[in-house]
Amino acid sequence: MSESIVHVSFSSAGGAGSVAKILSDEQARQGMKSSVLSVIRSDLRAAPLSAPLHTIAAGVDEYLVKSPGFRAPISLFRDASPGLESAIPSGADIIHLHGLNGAVTIDALTRVAQDRKVVWTLHDMNPFTGACHYSLGCADFVTDCASCPAVKAPFRGSVKRHLAKKIEAMGEIPGLSIVAPSTWLADLARKSATFRDHHISVIPNPVNPTYLQNEDDQVGDGREKGFRAMAIAKNLADPVKAIDIAVSAFHKATRGIGDAQLSLVGRGGETFAGHNINLRGQLNSRELAHELSHCDVLIVPSRAENAPLVIAEAAARGCIPLVADVGGMREMIMTLGHGVTFSNPEELTGLLEGQIKDRAQGKATDRRKVAQSARTAFSPEAIVARYGKVYEGRE
């Protein structure tokens, strides 16, 4: 493939930015001309001065615009912030969009996309809503978002106009291809007023190659110190990630078991500190891969998710994922053929008790089989091959 590809994402960290980098690195490894453009390397909470205008806009969205009772993030004023449009090389043949909020405005997108192939990987619902990143049951994105529950009443007109602008813009980009990492998100996008007339491909997100290395460590037992569980979130206090559910269920399931441990990975989490709770802070990929190799289960209790990479990453280390039955997570479990979904905290407690019992009786799932399933389904090589067909208009 001789065409040049530029991946665009507001941050090179987080889910969208990580996927952009993994794809670009693998494409470059295969000899393609591929690069990543991002505004910041971290996130606005961790490094607010890295993009001060975007930080202010994000603060306005969070504290002035968003309805206090709405638990998912929104982007409205942030979408109007100038970003990378002037930095996109004029010679790029393919523009591959990821996390667009604050990276490229909708108005600018229609200008830079002219006469070029545009691929947009959806990492949440925001590309086809007026503001929210997850609608949490609201279906207004099917029409016009006029009664948006995510924002305070004075801003609902702005949300409606923003969605109308997205709908109009998508009709002005002839070379646009849409990709969703899960059937769940693809189905919602197909129902939306924004992408109703577009073909949407479903391609899983790739696993960071770091989690596929050091196979002996990846599948080694290394769990001689008792039952080990882990929960991960960029911000452990994020209400959407619902880490409190994981902590509560773990305490109930391990009552009377002195050597069990739940590791919490991410920023904050001080309110969860207590007996058998290990606050690990933020870990890099290599550190996290090593820790997952020594965990029995990963708990993902989120109230809303698309297809979080951490599920495949944990499985690639032989760790069993226990995930809430929301978004595209059930589909990931079915693809892996390993792991379990739960519908409420009581079910999670029961699953943890079952894992502890199986481990004690020597019936734990073969970690090598779990790791091999993840490698087969989510390797960068396989995912890049799928995207190659999208670039060529064959998928």
Region roles according to the model:
Residues 266-289:
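Nucleotide-activated donor-binding/catalytic signature segment of Leloir-type glycosyltransferases, i.e.
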Residues 303:
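Aromatic "clamp/platform" in nucleotide-sugar-dependent glycosyltransferases that forms part
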Residues 320-323:
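Short hydrophobic beta-strand element within catalytic cores of glycosyltransferases
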Residues 217-219, 361-392:
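A charged, aromatic-enriched C-terminal amphipathic alpha-helix characteristic of glycosyltransferases
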Residues 290-295, 387:
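Short alpha-helical donor nucleotide-sugar binding micro-motif in glycosyltransferases
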Residues 184, 206:
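Carbohydrate-associated surface elements
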Residues 335-347, 354-360:
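Conserved acidic donor-binding segment of nucleotide-sugar-dependent glycosyltransferases
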Residues 220-241, 247-250:
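Conserved donor-binding/catalytic core segment of Leloir-type glycosyltransferases
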